[in-house]
């Protein structure tokens, strides 16, 4: 993951910090974390990143519009959820996902499978 820029979209501070530490230890550069839908949309507009970890519920607001934009723009990303499959809209169910709380090894494996480095 060395040098891979990962945009972290997560509203829970301790979870975002855990993701930041795990990915940083693996050599990734962290963009964010950002905690709201508005901040996520702004980061997509302004930030340079290779892939995204996206929580689908940001401060009680659905981040589905963010996911839809990432799909439309062709970005590589994984959905993060603590609510399981029923919380994911049907049109997003085929996307890579990880359950919260994150298992650090599972998170790294998922991002390697997404091949974020080639996304650059």
Pin down the residues of each PLM region.
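Hydrophobic/aromatic residues positioned on beta-strands within the core alpha/beta folds
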Residues: 80-81
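Non-catalytic signal-transmission and effector/linker regions of two-component phosphorelay proteins
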Residues: 1-5, 89, 103-120
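A Lys-centered signature of the CheY-like receiver
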Residues: 100
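Conserved acidic carboxylate
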Residues: 10
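Two-component/phosphorelay signaling modules centered on CheY-like receiver
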Residues: 13-32
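Acidic catalytic/metal-coordinating carboxylates
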Residues: 60-65
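Acidic, metal-coordinating helix/loop segments flanking the phosphotransfer/catalytic sites
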Residues: 33-51
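Active-site residues of response regulator receiver
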Residues: 55
């Amino acid at each position: 993951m060395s040098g891979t820029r990962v945009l972290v979209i997560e509203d829970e501070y301790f979870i975002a910090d855990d993701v930041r530490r795990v990915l940083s230890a693996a050599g990734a550069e962290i963009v964010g974390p950002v905690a709201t839908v508005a901040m996520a949309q702004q980061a997509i507009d302004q930030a340079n990143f290779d892939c995204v970890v996206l929580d689908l519920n940001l401060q009680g607001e659905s981040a589905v519009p963010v996911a839809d934009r990432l799909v439309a723009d062709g970005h590589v990303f994984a959905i993060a959820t603590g609510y399981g499959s029923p919380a994911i809209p049907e049109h997003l169910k085929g996307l890579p996902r990880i359950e919260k709380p994150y298992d650090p090894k599972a998170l790294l494996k998922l991002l390697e499978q997404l091949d974020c480095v080639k996304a650059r």
